[in-house]
Amino acid sequence: MEKYEKLEKVGEGTYGKVYKALEKSTGQVVALKKTRLEMDEEGVPPTALREVSLLQMLSQSLYVVRLLSVEHVDCAKNGKPLLYLVFEYLDTDLKKFIDSHRKGPNPRPLPPQQIQSFLFQLCKGVSHCHAHGVLHRDLKPQNLLLDKDKGVLKIADLGLARAFTVPLKSYTHEIVTLSYRAPEVLLGSSHYSTAVDMSSVGCIFAEMVRRQALFPGDSEFQQLLHIFRLLGTPSDEQWPGVSSLRDWHVYPQWEPQNSAPAVPSLGPDGLDLLTKTLKYDPADRISAKAALDHPYFDTLDKSQF
């Protein structure tokens, strides 16, 4: 790792520690992700190789953080080599951007054109992942990095991504920050699809408009109460099979509310798109690809993307 000079630790990702670093030969600032995936006697474990090849494939999109290289390092501590992933570096994320508009010296709404542009780029990135058979499963504002000068948004931290080309694989539950978690995951469904990411996209969209989480639960139960209070408690007619999901019968039966007051500055097209991302039945939820053609984006200059 002599090639890089670590400047500061900038976080803990799904992979492990993340550092801001300088590539000495070029002067380029990069993000170094030290993976927890230690190599075994055979070399790099197949899971790590799969993850890396997936990241390389996905980072061909402008809207996914680019993986620049992979470095093998001999670790003196236990003699096991480590794997560092070298990514392009972006200095802020959507959470910090929203927070800067909510608090601080100059609280103000995000400009509608900015929301439109960020959402379009997010849908482009998600559509790219889905087209390559990958669910992100942990989309949240902290995982959406921004190049503020260029107005570009990029999806990061695909550490929980799994190829979903194996149909209806039983996935593990422990994923996704609660506020962006899809109802089928919260209700314990172990079979899910690309629709889980679109539910997160809807929550992120609403948060850009509101500057605070749409469903700010601190437990799975609380999270579902927030969702059901606004969208109504789903029925088997709306969402076939929902009543057979875990803990279903403990929830009060609420009627759906008008969502408009929750996102007061959003026009009819925006509200329609939001509603389509938050549909209960995953099969009815709008796809990322279809979202790109939604009338909400008609006033956006798409030639720039």
Curated annotation (Swiss-Prot):
Its EC number is 2.7.11.22, 2.7.11.23. The keyword Cell division applies. Keywords: ATP-binding, Cell cycle, Cell division, Kinase, Mitosis, Nucleotide-binding, Phosphoprotein, Serine/threonine-protein kinase, Transferase. ATP binds at residues 10-18, 33. Residues 4-297 form the Protein kinase domain. The keyword Cell division applies. GO terms for cellular component: cyclin-dependent protein kinase holoenzyme complex; cytoplasm; nucleus. It comes from the Eukaryota. SMART domains: S_TKc. InterPro entries: CDK, Kinase-like_dom_sf, Prot_kinase_dom, Protein_kinase_ATP_BS, Ser/Thr_kinase_AS. The modification Phosphotyrosine is found at residue 15. Gene3D superfamilies: Phosphorylase Kinase, domain 1 (3.30.200.20), Transferase(Phosphotransferase) domain 1 (1.10.510.10). It catalyses: L-seryl-[protein] + ATP = O-phospho-L-seryl-[protein] + ADP + H(+); L-threonyl-[protein] + ATP = O-phospho-L-threonyl-[protein] + ADP + H(+); [DNA-directed RNA polymerase] + ATP = phospho-[DNA-directed RNA polymerase] + ADP + H(+). One of its GO terms (biological process) is G1/S transition of mitotic cell cycle. It holds the Pfam family Pkinase. The active site is at residue 138. The modification Phosphothreonine is found at residues 14, 172. Plays a key role in the control of the eukaryotic cell cycle. Belongs to the protein kinase superfamily. CMGC Ser/Thr protein kinase family. CDC2/CDKX subfamily. This is Cell division control protein 2 homolog C. It comes from Antirrhinum majus. The lineage of its organism: Eukaryota, Viridiplantae, Streptophyta, Embryophyta, Tracheophyta. The gene is CDC2C.
